[in-house]
Design a protein with these regions (language model features):
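Pre-recognition alpha-helix immediately N-terminal to the DNA-recognition helix
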Residues: 16-17, 28, 123-126, 133-137
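DNA-recognition helix of helix-turn-helix
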Residues: 65, 79, 124, 135, ...
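Acidic, proline/glycine-rich intrinsically disordered inter-domain spacer in sigma factors
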Residues: 100-129
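A short, charge-rich alpha-helical start-of-domain segment used by transcription regulators
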Residues: 7-31
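Structural recognition of an alpha-helix C-terminal capping motif at a helix-to-coil junction
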Residues: 45-52, 56, 64-76
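Short helix-capping/turn signature of helix-turn-helix
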Residues: 24-26, 36, 140-148
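Arg/Lys-rich amphipathic alpha helix in sigma70-family domain 2
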Residues: 72-94, 117, 180
Length: 185
């Protein structure tokens, strides 16, 4: 079934929509959630919440890229669950990925946090547009999908060391760009 047909099922409020969505994009959403939470039960619960979130979001939304839409909802829910401390077991992959980016991101703080988060997201998106396909792939798989570095390297067809060095250079470029734009002080 095509994404457009699945979206049409959501607009018709057909319960078949969730089954078709899970069949087509469930593995991608599960991978995102599992990489963040690390626990099978938490992953299953978060996926159930994801399907409900998509059900509530379509309509009114009609996403152009359904898999990205689903993975974004899944990632946001998994991140909230992770930070709320409800994950019973954490394997540290998500913490490690966030620690790698710590020098590139402004400190959280106070009233400005919400505004600076939007500004930061826009700056990172502009930065990603400047990267080569390979560097953007590495960055997104490591920091958006929270994939382990050996997995990202294998997916990119390069050695662990090469991937690690390239990601380090990308983080340095990101830090420089954020400093230049005044997002990181």
């Amino acid at each position: 079934m095509t994404d457009e047909e699945i979206i049409d099922l959501f607009f018709e409020r057909s319960e078949q929509a969730i089954g078709e969505l899970a069949k087509k994009h469930g593995r991608a959403a599960e991978r995102v959630v599992r990489n963040i939470l690390g626990d099978r039960r938490d992953t299953e619960e978060c996926l159930s919440d994801t399907w409900l979130g998509v059900w509530n979001a379509i309509p009114p939304n009609r996403p152009e890229l359904l898999q990205s839409f689903v993975c974004k909802i899944a990632r946001n829910l998994a991140t909230k669950r992770y930070h709320a401390g409800t994950a019973r077991k954490r394997d540290g992959r998500y913490d490690l990925a966030l620690d790698e980016l710590a020098d590139c991101l402004p400190d959280r703080g106070g009233v400005e946090e919400l505004l600076s988060a939007k500004e930061l997201a826009e700056a990172i998106n502009r930065f990603l547009d400047t990267l080569s396909y390979e560097d953007r792939f590495l960055f997104m798989r490591r920091y958006w999908y929270a994939e382990a570095l050996p997995v990202v390297a294998r997916m990119a067809g390069m050695s662990y060391g090469t991937a690690a060095v390239r990601l380090h250079r990308v983080r340095e470029k990101l830090k420089k760009q954020l400093l230049k734009e005044g997002v990181l002080i």
